[in-house]
Amino acid sequence: MRLWNKSFGKETKVKDFAGRTIAKGAYNDRNSDCGWNVDHILPQSRGGATADHNLVCCHILTNDEKADKFPCFNANGVSFEIIKVQNHYEIRQKTNEPKKQKDAPETVDF
């Protein structure tokens, strides 16, 4: 509950990063539509720490879909990627924008 309180304060129902509703009173309750647990952003199997900066409250189904996938995964029909930001990892929704080649011109005239 400490991570819930740190993340959401006094809120009793919120949406996780994948858009699923979780309820404070449904911690680890697989029989609840709003059941949630704590997930490692960078999986422990990949060296992720059990520290607040690497933990996120999420719906049990979201956690099941993410599992130990790294760096990309799908949850609730949405694509996500785990990226390193300074000294920690974050979950970001993937965008459909094509990546630009380094030093490639913005436009090409013919």
Positions of predicted regions on the chain:
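Short, charged surface segments at domain edges that flank catalytic/cofactor-binding sites
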Residues: 1-28
